[in-house]
């Protein structure tokens, strides 16, 4: 399994943790060891552009998934092989959501990584039943990953004095009455 992590933000993020998480989740979902995944951290403007282009929705969002080979979870004896796809996350939006949820930005980004992988595997949350199944699975995966790592907590931080890119995005786009979602 190959997981490439790219950080195009000012956030200081330990890519190895996200690589380990991606490999672990793919193995739990019975994705082939020959499969590839890319996780990219971006600022509000790039994810807002992707959000508009692919979802026709304005403003930055937390995570977007771009499947490649449309792999699905393997059954008990079969592993799927191919390129799983790309996940794009915005730490700025994740930090805002983490604050509202009462946990760390790192925990939120790890949850969003799992959420993105599940989307790549065909999970969705359009109906209440789909939401219950997907959100339950992502929570179970995250808690199990935390338990296996025995609480080894890493942090996502910003260098002192880094401007708030999400607030800047909101200010730049406020003239049109649009703010981050």
UniProtKB/Swiss-Prot annotation:
Transmembrane portions of the chain: none
Signal peptide positions on this chain: none
Organism listed in the record: Bifidobacterium adolescentis (strain ATCC 15703 / DSM 20083 / NCTC 11814 / E194a)
Gene3D superfamilies listed in its UniProt record: Metalloproteases ('zincins'), catalytic domain
Residues given in the record as Zn(2+) binding sites: 115, 119, 125
Subcellular location: Cytoplasm
Function text: Single strand-specific metallo-endoribonuclease involved in late-stage 70S ribosome quality control and in maturation of the 3' terminus of the 16S rRNA.
Lineage of origin: Bacteria, Bacillati, Actinomycetota, Actinomycetes, Bifidobacteriales
Protein name, as recorded: Endoribonuclease YbeY
Cofactor comment: Binds 1 zinc ion.
Top-level EC class as recorded in UniProt: hydrolase
């Amino acid at each position: 399994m190959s997981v490439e992590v790219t950080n195009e933000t000012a956030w200081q993020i330990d890519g190895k943790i996200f690589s380990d998480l991606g490999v672990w989740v793919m193995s739990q979902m019975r994705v082939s060891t020959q499969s590839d995944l890319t996780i990219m951290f971006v600022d509000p403007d790039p994810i807002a552009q992707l959000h508009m282009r692919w979802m026709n929705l304005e403003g930055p969002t937390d995570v977007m998934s771009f499947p490649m080979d449309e792999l699905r979870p393997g059954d008990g004896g079969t592993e799927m092989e191919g390129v799983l796809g790309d996940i794009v996350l915005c730490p700025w939006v994740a930090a805002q959501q983490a604050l509202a949820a009462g946990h760390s930005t790192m925990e939120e980004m790890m949850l969003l990584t799992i959420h993105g992988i599940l989307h790549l595997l065909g999970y969705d949350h359009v109906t209440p039943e789909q939401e219950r199944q997907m959100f339950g699975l992502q929570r179970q995966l995250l808690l199990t990953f935390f338990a296996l790592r025995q609480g080894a907590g890493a942090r996502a931080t910003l260098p002192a004095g880094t401007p708030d890119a999400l607030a800047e995005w909101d200010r730049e786009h406020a003239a049109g009455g649009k703010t981050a979602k």
